[in-house]
Regions:
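Extracellular beta-rich repeat passengers
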Residues: 25-27, 32-46, 52-59, 64, ...
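Bacterial Sec-dependent N-terminal signal peptides
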Residues: 1-36
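Catalytic metal-binding/acid-base residues of hydrolase active sites
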Residues: 71
Length: 389
């Protein structure tokens, strides 16, 4: 009887195996579609391949979630100003992963083909003449500024924006890879890449938000830029790699307001590849690693600078005497543990009206500085090439 039971069991297993082999395996199609218009409620796009058409505005009370691994493609050929814009009160959730980033790109792979990601909040700003509100320079003419230091515009993690930085036809308005207007400290910005845009990689217009693990690669204007009294104080691991065309590694200004506060950024790598020219050509002297102007200030530590060796370029440029008097002599610019890897001079002013000298301890060097420390992954790879240099 035991032998009979065993034989029947083997037959049953064999039949089950045959049945399994004959089953059809089906795969679900990858979602596609167009993201366009205003978003006024909660909207989620699952992992898929989408197009963006026109300026998509996330209105107050609305939210947009795009799942990890998705690709969103703009097109200069559609004749619209493609951009993703978060208005104050709206929220954007792009929570990619190292292996599955959320990628925004453009069909022709032409720098400046679309407007990138733009976010507005109501965190504090200090604009020209001390004003606390201002109008955006992205062509949308939206007001920004407020008193909400903890403004929360959502979460951006492992996001790559390619070929953005659209310049508008009025010759004054422009967009960047990422533009943050009075964004607050409740917003999460981590592991973001701005790749080959026609303007700045990242620009902060006031606000209190901080950003971790940023890569600005091959952008035509400045790699990192801010104004309007931006005061994010928990920034770390910023990498700029300028190649072919690029201006300043970091352009730092405060609209000529002598603020008592400033941002803090630790672990910075600024690299300019050989042969890189400024956006304006040989006539534009915008080739320094770091420029302070109009009372820009802040504390920057563990900084590694390489390749800024164009004639007359310098690691740190103080652009005007007011900035030197108020911020350098006033002790509100600190550059700590700076390592210069080549013949780039340490710092210089403009003209002959002042000679740059820092108070003791406010400019220090170190041969062991490491700069940005970033973890490799698909989030930082384009066309098979790692952006982490």
């Amino acid at each position: 009887m035991k032998k009979l039971v065993l034989s029947l069991s083997i037959v049953a297993l064999s039949l089950g195996s045959c049945s399994s082999d004959n089953e059809e395996i089906t795969t679900q199609p990858i979602p596609t579609g167009t993201i366009t218009g205003d978003i006024t409620t909660a909207k989620t796009y699952p992992l898929g391949n989408y197009t963006i058409q026109g300026t998509v505005k996330i209105k107050s009370g609305g939210s947009l979630t795009i799942e990890a691994g998705s690709t969103i493609t703009a097109s200069i050929a559609d004749g619209t100003a493609d951009a993703l814009l978060v208005e104050n009160g709206g929220k954007l959730f792009l929570n990619g992963t190292s292996a599955l980033p959320v990628v925004f790109t453009e069909t022709s792979k032409t720098p400046g083909s679309w407007g990138g990601i733009i976010m507005f909040g109501d965190a504090p700003i200090v604009g020209a003449n001390g004003v606390t509100t201002a109008t955006s320079e992205d062509g949308n003419n939206l007001a920004y500024g407020g008193t909400n230091t903890a403004h929360n515009g959502g979460s951006l993690k492992y996001v790559r924006v390619e070929y953005a930085g659209k310049k508008l036809t009025d010759n004054t308005s422009e967009m960047n890879g990422f533009s943050f207007y009075s964004v607050g400290s409740g917003t999460v910005l981590e592991n973001l890449v701005a790749y080959k845009g026609a303007d700045d990689g990242f620009e902060f217009y006031g606000g209190t938000v901080s950003a971790k693990n940023l890569i600005s690669y091959g952008n035509f204007d400045d790699s990192f830029d801010w104004q309007d009294g931006w005061r994010g104080d928990a920034n770390t691991n910023w990498l700029a790699y300028q190649v072919a065309t690029g201006n300043y590694g970091m352009e730092i200004e405060a609209k000529s307001v002598n603020n008592a506060f400033g941002p803090k950024v630790s672990n910075i790598t600024l690299t300019r590849a050989a042969g890189t020219v400024t956006e304006g050509g040989s006539s534009a002297a915008e080739y320094d690693a770091i420029q302070f102007k109009k009372d820009g200030n802040g504390e920057y530590s563990n900084v590694v600078i390489s390749g800024y060796t164009t004639a007359n370029s310098t690691a740190v440029r103080i652009q005007d005497k007011a900035t030197f008097d108020n911020q350098v002599t006033g002790g509100k610019i600190k550059l700590l543990n700076v390592k210069i890897n080549d013949g780039t001079s340490q710092f210089a002013g403009v003209g002959t009206t002042f000679t740059v000298a820092f108070p003791t301890g406010n400019y220090t060097t170190s041969t062991t500085s490491t700069g940005a420390t970033l973890t490799a992954g698909a989030w930082a790879i384009v066309d098979g090439v790692s952006l982490i240099k």
